[in-house]
UniProtKB/Swiss-Prot annotation:
Protein name: Cruciform DNA-recognizing protein 1
Low complexity bias: start-end ranges: 166-177
Pfam families with a match to the protein in the record: AMPK1_CBM (PF16561)
UniProt region (Disordered), positions on chain: 107-227, 247-275, 305-465
Modified residues (Phosphoserine): S153, S156, S271, S319, S343, S394, S440
Role: Cruciform DNA-binding protein which exerts an enhancing effect on the cleavage of cruciform DNA (X-DNA) by endonuclease VII from bacteriophage T4.
UniProt gene name: CRP1
Organism encoding this protein: Saccharomyces cerevisiae (strain JAY291) (Baker's yeast)
Gene3D superfamilies with a match to the protein in the record: Immunoglobulins
Length: 465
């Protein structure tokens, strides 16, 4: 076990300075433990003091507002020349000890927090029984007092009624109760109270605060200091409401703008000024005389040579009066008939072309060689005109063409019958066809021209040539 001794001790400094710091051997004289200022104004701190043995001492010193000082309430000793410290011995520490087991607050430098609470456990039954007995005694005493008071009050009421019957007075006048008879407490002035009790806001009951507030939007009416100088308070006008409404609601007639003469931009010459209302009538007659002189000059203009006459429009034809004699219009009817004929002929020509195309499509395609025919020359205008005029000639030509085609087909059938291939030639052709299938595309392409020359169709071509 260690031989160190531990004691809790309270260091104090009287009120007056701002800051007090405790230092000593416990912190190597570094001044790290400030004292706490209490409500009374003095400085205190409770901390544990360690002593190595019974003969050891605890040396310390105070730093008051930055000045190292020694307290007269503690013992002093001279360590060296000019240096003096306070100290504590074991006897000083034992005298100031309190009840053991009190809890300390380490953050507050070991300040006492109070006695430790009692250990948890069931409450004692003896205390409960004692409390119940005491409560019963109190209740019984209160009941006795209440019964005595009721009896006294009933006796006093009976006595008062007897006295009233003898004197003939009523019991309307009743003495005041205890609350009514107690005097009111005199109001105490706030200024005479203790210095610690004060109000946050001062109360000034002066005449200025009782007056109305002149600020706009504040409480009370606005009082102007110079009402006589303001015109709105003195001037009064009498206005008739009907007259004012009629005058305001009256619609003012707006004059319409006069449309002036429109002058075209193409006119370059200045036109003569129009006569005004104030001018004499003679000037207008002169203007009319000048206009009449200009009209015959316009009529005297001769027409140009070889000028085409304008055709009459349908509007002009309508505007001709009925009294004038109208010749029969034969030329217009003829032109209409010609147009109808041309349209019908065009339709017939289109139908003929369609028939010719269908006939060409219906031609029989055979395996016979094609004979070179001379190209057909385009028809001239005369031939087309003749074909249109004489449909019988075109029918004869078509019959001739059909006969020629039939004769050609008969000749082809006869030649094919005469030159039918024999059985050997057929076998050769089958062998050649099989060789064609097995041959490569390159060899087949090279042998094609030779086959054309030696084939059956080649011989037929030579005959027709």
């Amino acid at each position: 076990m260690s031989s160190e001794l531990m004691f809790n001790y309270t260091f104090s400094w009287p009120a007056g300075p701002k800051d007090v710091i405790l230092t000593g051997t416990f912190d190597d004289w570094r001044g790290t433990l400030p004292l706490v200022k209490t409500a009374k104004g003095n400085f205190e701190i409770t901390m544990p003091v360690k002593l190595a043995n019974k003969d050891d001492t605890f040396q310390f010193k105070f730093i008051v507002d930055g000045v190292w000082c020694v307290s007269d309430s503690y013992k002093k000793e001279h360590v060296s020349e000019g240096i003096e410290n306070n100290f504590l011995q074991i006897t000083d520490l034992v005298e100031t000890q309190e009840v053991a087991g009190a809890s300390r607050i380490p953050e507050a430098g070991g300040l006492l927090c109070g006695k430790p609470p009692r250990s948890a456990g069931p409450p004692s039954t003896s205390n409960r029984k004692k409390n119940k007995r005491n409560n019963k005694k109190r209740r019984s005493k209160l009941k006795k007092k209440s019964t005595k008071n009721n009896k006294n009050s009933n006796e006093s009421l009976d006595d008062n009624e007897e006295e009233d019957g003898v004197t003939g007075t009523t019991t309307e006048d009743v003495t005041g109760t205890s609350r009514e008879e107690t005097p009111l407490a005199e109001p105490t002035n706030v200024s005479k109270e203790a210095p610690g009790n004060f109000h946050i806001l001062p109360i000034d009951q002066s005449a200025d605060t009782t007056q109305s507030n002149g600020i706009i939007g504040g409480p009370g009416p606005v009082l102007v200091p110079n009402p006589g100088e303001i015109k709105e308070f003195t001037e009064i006008r009498d206005v008739d409401a009907r007259e004012l409404n009629e005058r305001l609601n009256k619609k003012e007639e707006v004059p319409e703008p006069v449309a002036g003469p429109i002058v075209e931009s193409s006119v370059t010459e200045k036109s003569p000024a129009l006569p005004q209302a104030d001018d004499p009538i003679v000037e207008t007659k002169e203007m009319a005389h000048n206009v009449q002189e200009l009209t015959p000059q316009v009529e005297a203009v001769t027409p140009l040579i070889n000028e085409p006459e304008p055709l009459p429009t349908p509007e002009a034809q309508i505007s001709i009066p009925e009294s004038s004699k109208v010749e029969p219009v034969e030329g217009s009817l003829q032109s209409k008939l010609v147009e109808k004929r041309e349209s019908t002929e065009g339709v017939l020509d289109g139908s003929k072309k369609v028939e010719n195309k269908a006939k060409k499509d219906e031609e029989v395609f055979t395996l016979d060689p094609i004979v070179n025919k001379a190209p057909k020359l385009p028809l001239t205008d005369e031939q087309t005109a003749e074909g249109r005029k004489s449909p019988a000639v075109s029918e004869e030509k078509e019959k001739k063409k059909k006969q020629e085609k039939g004769s050609k087909e008969v000749k082809r059938s006869e030649t094919s019958k005469e030159k039918k291939p024999s059985a050997k030639e057929v076998k050769k052709q089958t062998v050649k066809a099989s060789k064609k299938q097995t041959a490569s595309p390159l060899s087949s392409s090279t042998e094609e021209p030779k086959k054309k020359k030696t084939g059956f169709f080649g011989k037929l071509k030579k005959l027709f040539k």
